[in-house]
């Protein structure tokens, strides 16, 4: 696998989202400018100044209490779970919706913002193939997230790629990652769930980018070879910390991939999330109950719930 590359963007970054304090100050300045057009502005009284100072203080307190981009932990290479991985799980869920706006301090880049970075918004969504992705930013880090399996076209992508055939969604994922890498360099992280996890792993290996995946689809050696990637070297680097892959206990996809050599395993260092859905009594003898549990375990909502409860990034969990 190639070493991570560093690029310097030649375009202007997305304008920072104004804080409540900045917005209040902007509105005050605009009011004064407007008043200046219609006549001289009288000096504000001491009461007015006191009221404005109080307003600014209150706005500042509200801003400080709210989650900020600076408070969101960055995601870096490594085998151990990181707190920022939880934010990526939330984004891996958000990207399933075309109207998703982001989560955990990350905002989804608008079409105009993407164009400003030289990225074609149309390259992130293809109704024909089922491909769907989004790019998010907290002004410090950028996340390229891929949606997973949500219709029959995605299942076809799973089967084609796993059995060694060329698949358009994987090609689109690599192309999107190359564009994002050129724009954001080492500030880019890639994430995805299910099929999206397989896309994320492939895109990460093709661009030398850190990735975090959730209940990810496996990536075949045929796919890696086709992209000019040495499978053995890529898997070794991913296991060493290039890719962290979270798998929920009882997840049907992970269990199936690891129980047969006919389909590939997910790539990366595995972090297992314990599943607290215990089957007892007669339920433990009913295949339908086990199937229901494995299907639920595969969903991104269950992954998010387990991460929130277990906090695997804490030191005692990583010891």
Swiss-Prot record:
InterPro entries named among the record's database cross-references: AB_hydrolase_fold (IPR029058)
Reaction(s) catalysed by this chain's protein: a 1,2-diacyl-sn-glycero-3-phosphocholine + H2O = a 2-acyl-sn-glycero-3-phosphocholine + a fatty acid + H(+)
Signal peptide (UniProt feature, chain positions): 1-24
SUPFAM superfamilies per record: alpha/beta-Hydrolases (SSF53474)
The enzyme's E.C. designation: 3.1.1.32
Keywords recorded for this protein, A-Z: Hydrolase, Lipid degradation, Lipid metabolism, Signal
Protein name in UniProt: Extracellular phospholipase A1
Natural source organism: Serratia liquefaciens
Gene: phlA
């Amino acid at each position: 696998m190639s070493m991570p590359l560093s690029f310097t963007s030649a375009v202007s970054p997305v304008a920072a989202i104004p804080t409540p304090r900045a917005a209040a100050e902007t509105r005050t300045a605009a009011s004064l400018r407007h008043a200046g057009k219609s006549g001289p502005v009288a000096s504000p009284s001491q009461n007015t100044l006191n009221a404005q100072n109080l307003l600014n203080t209150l706005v500042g307190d509200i801003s400080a209490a709210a989650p900020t981009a600076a408070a969101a932990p960055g995601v870096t290479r490594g085998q151990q779970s990181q707190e920022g991985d939880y934010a990526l799980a939330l984004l891996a869920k958000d990207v399933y919706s075309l109207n998703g706006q982001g989560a955990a301090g990350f905002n989804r880049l608008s079409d105009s913002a993407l164009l400003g970075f030289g990225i074609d918004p149309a390259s992130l969504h293809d109704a024909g193939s089922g491909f769907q992705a989004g790019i998010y930013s907290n002004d410090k880090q950028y996340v390229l997230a891929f949606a997973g399996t949500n219709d029959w076209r995605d299942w076809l992508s799973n089967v084609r790629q796993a059995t060694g055939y060329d698949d358009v969604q994987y090609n689109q994922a690599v192309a999107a990652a190359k564009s994002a890498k050129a724009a954001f360099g080492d500030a880019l992280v890639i994430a995805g769930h299910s099929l999206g996890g397989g896309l994320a792993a492939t895109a990460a290996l093709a661009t030398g980018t850190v990735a975090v995946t959730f209940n990810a689809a496996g990536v075949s050696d045929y796919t890696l070879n086709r992209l000019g990637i040495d499978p053995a070297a890529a898997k070794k680097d991913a296991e060493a910390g290039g890719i962290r892959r979270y798998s929920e206990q009882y997840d049907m996809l992970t269990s199936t991939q690891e129980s047969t050599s006919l389909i590939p395993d997910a790539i990366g260092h595995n972090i297992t999330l314990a599943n607290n859905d215990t089957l007892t009594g007669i339920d433990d003898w009913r295949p339908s109950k086990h199937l229901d549990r494995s299907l639920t375990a595969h969903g991104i909502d269950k992954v998010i719930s387990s991460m929130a409860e277990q906090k695997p990034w804490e030191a005692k969990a990583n010891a």
